[in-house]
């Protein structure tokens, strides 16, 4: 299956930059674990294709229903991601993301913290959600789960 690999790049203060034109080789990572995550109920297309797709992949008893359809899609995606993450947990920090059309990806959490990622965001790019996702959530217990930021991104898209 074709797909993009998302990377969180953090500056490592313990590594010095070369003084010449030496090429720094990129680290190669294993191919992410794409899985099939089939629908568990029939779609109701009254809210459109994407929200219908999302809603067919969780049995939440209506927990994530919201009159604002964007909020409903966002929160339901978080719920699906959580179900997948918990199902495939094998004792090491892992995250999972539902990517529509019965596709999901499972990734190992990188060995970095959200606070480290936050320091690398230029002040000029720190918009309205910066404090919520990169400061408050990091302090609330998600700090060692840098892929939480991808969970938010996937849930908004």
Feature-to-residue mapping (PLM):
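Generic detector of short, aliphatic-rich beta-strand segments that form the cores of beta-sheets
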Residues: 5-9
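Short pre-active-site segment immediately N-terminal to the catalytic Zn-binding motif
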Residues: 54-71
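Extended, helix-rich scaffolding/adaptor regions
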Residues: 10-58
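Pan-zinc metallopeptidase signature
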Residues: 2-4, 157
């Amino acid at each position: 299956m074709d797909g993009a690999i998302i990377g969180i790049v953090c500056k490592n203060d313990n590594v010095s930059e070369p003084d010449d034109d030496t090429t720094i080789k990129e680290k190669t990572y294993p191919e992410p674990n794409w899985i099939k995550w089939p629908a568990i109920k029939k779609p109701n297309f009254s809210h459109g294709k994407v929200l219908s797709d999302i809603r067919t992949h969780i049995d939440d008893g209506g927990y994530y229903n919201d009159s604002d359809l964007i909020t409903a899609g966002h929160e339901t995606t978080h719920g699906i991601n959580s179900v997948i993450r918990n199902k495939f947990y094998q004792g090491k920090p892992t995250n999972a993301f539902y990517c529509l059309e019965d596709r999901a990806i499972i990734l190992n959490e990188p060995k970095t913290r959200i606070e480290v990622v936050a320091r690398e965001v230029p002040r000029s790019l720190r918009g309205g959600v910066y404090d919520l996702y990169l400061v408050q959530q990091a302090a609330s217990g998600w700090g060692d789960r840098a892929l939480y930021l991808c969970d938010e991104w996937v849930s908004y898209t």
